[in-house]
Amino acid sequence: MSSAALVPADDILEPTLQSILDQKSLRWIFVGGKGGVGKTTTSCSLAIQLAKVRKSVLLISTDPAHNLSDAFGQKFGKEARLVDGFDNLSAMEIDPSASMQDLLAAGGEQGEDMGFGLGGMMQDLAFSIPGVDEAMSFAEVLKQVKSLSYEVIVFDTAPTGHTLRFLQFPTVLEKGLAKLSQLSNQFGPMLNSVLGARGGLPGGQNLDEVLSKMESLRETISEVNAQFKDADLTTFVCVCIAEFLSLYETERMIQELTSYQIDTHAIVVNQLLFPGKDSTCEQCKARRKMQKKYLDEIAELYEDFNVVRMPLLVEEVRGKEKLERFSDMLVHPYQPPQE
């Protein structure tokens, strides 16, 4: 089920994310799950813990909803900036559609006319490549990562379906660039003459220069694609709640990650109720009974995973102090009252 190595039956895995903190070779950590399960809170908290043991950590949101700013109470954008109160933890929020428009406009004034003529054709061609929005988001990430040196990068990904596309796009973009290169070889001279008649591409570039840049991007993506499939460098943390649909999504996600050869060996189960044995809340007890059923299923299905059980908290986890308290429970298991 997991691409991580199986452990002996008598070896009970810790119910924490300590193994991720201890694995110093990790460079890419993805955090994903169904919407509304506490994915952003978990990714922020994991990044906080990593900042204690790594020289530099970058937290990136690829979710169009962008909740990092809300979680930390600080505005982030497409440029990496330090999180208040930290000297080695930075964050950024990437808008995939904006990244795509930036690429098409190439920063030139003529970009405003890109909806017409050849520009419109190129835009249609670009958007016809499956997963191209995530691919452009990834290209934006690569630009940042290449210009700034971070020891480990944590991705707060979009809800499940988009996450899996996000992990596919290195391959998708490689194929798309190969097709564009083939088109260039066939129609390059004709396209260059048409471009020349229209004043060329924005920024004064010719088609060959654009394709050369894209080929360079393809090589970088190919290298990162190989890193994604290396369990020493990359892992995926699944986040869920103890309900049927969330568990179903988690199982589907783990199966797909395994098919992509991406390591996953940790699950964070959020929003758990732990009513005390003297509790008079019948609704709490009923919900706990339901949650326990799914927790038992998780324990049976994922015996070779680190499964972290996190309580439902009274207040929202927002701001540095609350995130730090939440993050402590990722490495020091929550001790519930006696049931």
Swiss-Prot record:
Keywords, in A-Z order: ATP-binding, Cytoplasm, Endoplasmic reticulum, Hydrolase, Metal-binding, Nucleotide-binding, Transport, Zinc
Positions with a binding annotation for ATP: K34, G35, G36, V37, G38, K39, T40, T41, E243, N270
Catalytic residues (UniProt): D63
MF GO annotations: ATP binding; ATP hydrolysis activity; metal ion binding
Compartments in which it is found: Cytoplasm; Endoplasmic reticulum
SUPFAM superfamilies: P-loop containing nucleoside triphosphate hydrolases (SSF52540)
Main localization, broad class: cytoplasm
Enzyme Commission no: 3.6.-.-
Entry binding sites for Zn(2+): C281, C284
Annotated GO CC locations: GET complex
Segments crossing the lipid bilayer: none
Gene Ontology annotations of biological process type: tail-anchored membrane protein insertion into ER membrane
PANTHER family with a match to the protein in the record: ARSENICAL PUMP-DRIVING ATPASE ARSENITE-TRANSLOCATING ATPASE, ATPASE GET3
NCBIfam families in the record: GET3_arsA_TRC40
Function: ATPase required for the post-translational delivery of tail-anchored (TA) proteins to the endoplasmic reticulum. Recognizes and selectively binds the transmembrane domain of TA proteins in the cytosol. This complex then targets to the endoplasmic reticulum by membrane-bound receptors, where the tail-anchored protein is released for insertion. This process is regulated by ATP binding and hydrolysis. ATP binding drives the homodimer towards the closed dimer state, facilitating recognition of newly synthesized TA membrane proteins. ATP hydrolysis is required for insertion.
Family: Belongs to the arsA ATPase family.
Oligomeric form and interacting partners: Homodimer.
The name this protein goes by in its record: ATPase GET3
Source organism: Coccidioides immitis (strain RS) (Valley fever fungus)
Taxonomic path: Eukaryota, Fungi, Dikarya, Ascomycota, Pezizomycotina
